UniProtKB/Swiss-Prot annotation:
Feature type site, description Important for catalytic activity: H143
Pathway connected to this protein: Lipid metabolism; butanoate metabolism
Induction details: Up-regulated upon acid shock and SDS stress.
Native species: Mycobacterium tuberculosis (strain ATCC 25618 / H37Rv)
Biophysicochemical property: pH dependence: Optimum pH is 10.
Listed name of the protein: 3-hydroxybutyryl-CoA dehydrogenase
MF GO annotations: 3-hydroxybutyryl-CoA dehydrogenase activity; NAD+ binding
InterPro entries: 3-OHacyl-CoA_DH, 3-OHacyl-CoA_DH_NAD-bd, 3HC_DH_C, 6-PGluconate_DH-like_C_sf, 6PGD_dom2, NAD(P)-bd_dom_sf
A GO-annotated cellular component: cytosol
Length: 286
């Protein structure tokens, strides 16, 4: 078994990938981030720089620590540049076919036999992407939460064939190096958090759809009555209604249970491009 993880690769520099890269670099780890296009690399780098600047302004990171983190980040459009990584975390679009193709390529490219290949998927069973590799025993789920620099939880998902040494090594990295709280769970769609969260969000949408209560009153009831920091409909907007639908679709496909099924109102809003905060309009206007 190789030494402690010091070289990390991240596939995808979107909201999640850039956050994972940032927290890894802030922890003193050498990080290589892959995106297939220079424009995506520029966007990802800018996202990380802005996040670090906010952290400096908030007094959470010194300017020296910011500069050190940025110095540990490398960006590439060549997947082969991840060949020497000890841990590669995939954080691309929530599409099984796309993820499977990436894992097949990573399995070919990453040469260290002890290297771990991890997916940040929030809903796809890990075995589905592990099956695309010739070494599924080194594949596991490592699901971070948005925003990655702020939320402390990581779900670590073992499949039926994941090597325990790989899981233990990854857990040590996430907890000791990144300072995350790790929850282990078995390989089923939604894992722990989304299996609880998604039915709750969909139930709130159904309540509004049925005219039982307004968007504002549903959120007010949860915030004022349950001390949640945010109501379910505003949270749905933050997650992204298209993302919520994708996760719900995957969970309904796996479990065939009605409470995982996306309600018609959610479907219509996604079709109309009302995706929540990122599009400027969802249950609220931004």
């Amino acid at each position: 078994m190789s030494d402690a993880i010091q070289r990390v690769g991240v596939v995808g520099a979107g909201q999640m990938g850039s956050g994972i890269a940032e927290v890894s670099a802030r922890a003193g780890v050498e990080v290589t981030v892959f995106e297939p296009a220079e424009a995506l690399i520029t966007a990802g780098r800018n996202r990380i720089v802005k996040s670090l600047e906010r952290a400096v302004s908030a007094g959470k990171v010194t300017e020296r620590e910011r500069d050190r983190a940025l110095g540990l980040l490398t960006f590439t459009t060549d997947l082969n540049d991840l060949s020497d990584r000890q841990l590669v975390i995939e954080a691309v679009v929530e599409d099984e076919a796309v993820k499977s193709e990436i894992f097949a390529e990573l399995d070919r490219v990453v040469t260290d036999p002890d290297a771990v290949l991890a997916s940040n998927t929030s809903s796809i069973p890990i075995m589905k992407v592990a099956a695309a590799t010739k070494q599924p025993q080194r594949v596991l789920g490592l699901h971070f939460f948005n925003p990655v620099p702020v939320l402390p939880l990581v779900e670590l998902v073992r499949t039926l064939v994941t090597d325990e040494a790989a899981a233990a090594r990854t857990e040590e990295f996430a907890s000791t190096v990144l300072g995350k709280q790790v929850v282990r769970c078995s390989d089923r769609s939604g894992f722990v958090v989304n299996a609880l969260l998604v039915p709750y969000l969909l139930s709130a949408i159904r309540m509004v759809e049925a005219g039982f209560a307004t968007v504002e009153d549903v959120d007010k009831a949860v915030v004022a009555g349950l001390s949640h920091p945010m109501g379910p409909l505003r949270l749905s907007d933050l997650v992204g209604l298209d993302t919520l639908k994708l996760i719900a679709d995957k969970m309904f496909e796996e479990f065939k249970e009605p409470h995982y099924g996306p309600p018609p109102l959610l479907l219509r809003m996604v079709e109309a491009g009302q995706l929540g905060k990122k599009s400027g309009r969802g249950f609220y206007t931004y």
